[in-house]
Amino acid sequence: MGSRCAKLGTGHGRGHESSMKKLVACVSQDNFSLSSEGEEEEEGEEEEEEEGEEEELPVQGKLLLMEAGQQEEGAEDADSEVQQSPEPKQTRS
């Protein structure tokens, strides 16, 4: 969970770059794992987890875009409320 927070904190571009660096690191670890079978199995599990995180990255990006869209809509709603508020006052007067 902590690693995901770190990825979000780094930003979109850096997040992708860091994931690429992690993939390179996995490759270098695989070279070492050839010398010991035990590490090979553990690293295999780690690779699967990292692949899952990479698949989630674009989803998180979409969520951020959706949040930005909601904020824009919220601003529009505020404007429409301001426009609507004088109308009832006019009918009252």
Curated annotation (Swiss-Prot):
Q: Which GO terms describe its biological process?
A: cell differentiation; chromosome condensation; flagellated sperm motility; spermatogenesis
Molecular function terms, GO-annotated = DNA binding
Q: Offer a single GO CC term for the protein.
A: cytoplasm
Where does this protein reside within or beyond the cell?
Nucleus; Chromosome
Region Disordered: which residues? 1-93
Instruction: Tell me which domain of life the UniProt entry assigns to the organism this sequence originates from.
Output: Eukaryota
Chain coiled-coil ranges: none
Q: Which residues carry this modification: Phosphoserine?
A: S85
Q: Where is the composition biased (Acidic residues)?
A: 37-57
Compositional bias ranges of the Polar residues kind: 81-93
Record keywords = Chromosome, Developmental protein, Differentiation, DNA condensation, DNA-binding, Nucleosome core, Nucleus, Phosphoprotein, Spermatogenesis
Principal subcellular localization: nucleus
State the family named in the UniProt similarity comment for this chain. Answer: Belongs to the protamine P3 family.
What does this gene product do? Answer: Protamines substitute for histones in the chromatin of sperm during the haploid phase of spermatogenesis. They compact sperm DNA into a highly condensed, stable and inactive complex.
Q: PANTHER family under this entry?
A: PROTAMINE-3, SPERM PROTAMINE P3
Q: What is this protein called?
A: Protamine-3
